[in-house]
Amino acid sequence: MKKSIVAICLGALVLGTLTGCFAGKSTASSGRGGEVTGVGGGRAFREPAPYGMTLVKRGWLRMGLEKQDSLWGKKTPVKDISVDGFWMDETEVTNSEYKQFVEWVRDSIIRTRLADPAYGGDESYMITEDKNGDPVTPHLDWNKRLPRKPNEDEQRAFESLYVTNPVTGEKSIDGRQLNYRFEIYDYTSAALRRNRLNPQERNLNTDITVDPNEVVMISKDTAYVDENGVIHSETINRPLTGPWDFLNTYIINIYPDTTCWVNDFRNSDNEIYLRNYFSNPTYNNYPVVGVTWEQANAFCAWRTEYLLKGLGKEARYVQRYRLPTEAEWEFAARGKNQDEFPWDNQNVKNGNGCFYANFKPDRGNYTKDGNLITSKVGIYGANSNGLYDMAGNVAEWTSTIYTEAGVDAMNDLNPQLDYKAAKEDPYRLKKKSVRGGSWKDPESYIRSAWRTWEYQNQPRSYIGFRCVRSLASSSSEAAKENKKSSKKKRR
């Protein structure tokens, strides 16, 4: 009887402990004079749910393949890790969404040329001063519409972005001119103690005498376009002089490489995809391919710029769009139960014989799952995190550099291994982790923990991407807010 009473008491104690994990004291101040009660921070920022994204709540994961690959004898690192919550695109970025990026870049070039004296010099397309008449850095006025009936100079500005094939006579946009310039501030490098501007802050060990004349060298990415329209990207090593040294500049040609359909499959008749996959509206809701890791990052930067221009003062709280880390991707793909696949069993077909994903079921048989190449995004069921196509369709870029050590070389808190390869670096240092498998891959490659890689400048017909965005706040309250995103309309 005593044992029963003790067991009941212990059970009640444990239950009370669990239910009261976050039942701490209220943070409301009493306002008592002379006491430290904290300052009023105002109303907490309620982050609006991003369109087409779903919330992946923070959690724990045993990352990697626990069952090692017996076929190749390849060992995959396994490690327990934790990641913070983040927003993630429900589907891969589609042709339609990427076309919006392409058209924005096209229109920005047209507006810039309309303001150029060589094309008429209409200065109203540029904003050069603020509302008070004070000068500002010149930038485009997107509120001014492009002319519907252009004059001769304006027509030349429009025509300058198009080319005519001398053989077929086809007129199309000149993708070689579609360059997007963006800047990324490297907060991590700027925060490193060794990069402090004040020498006294670089080492807190009072036994060490700090050299006030020490020269700190930093690496800075920069880029420019020469008079022939060629992009030159450089990594400069120079002495640290100020906070601007951590602002990196990139210029990326953003038009997808449609020739990847031919180059990826030699002795194969894929001309139809080369000509139609990106340009034909039939493929609008298919995942964009032929996009390099560098172009995917440019899209994330543009998407951030596009969003922030539409927000008010609260824009400072919103985090930038980016590619997921390798750890975030696997955590999101494996769902709430850490499944081997993005569904709740180890089969690739459901009870009705329907496949869970678009992949290559049999040798030489791409169509067994109902598809030949890619499929429309979101036609297969979502995983427990509300994410579609986390297995198959197209493999996906991550932000993480690929190494054999994988997660073993990373921290167990928000793991990431980042390396900004300079142009002169060996090519092997430009490998980026790719996850998820694709329409051309067998079953074993679409497992959520399967790792592979591709060079960051290599476009493929089977690699796409999706974006993530860190939560504006990682507090328990924030994780409960806005669970549902504004859903995409699927066609």
Where are these regions (language model features)?
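A short, compositionally biased domain-edge/stem linker segment
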Residues: 34-47
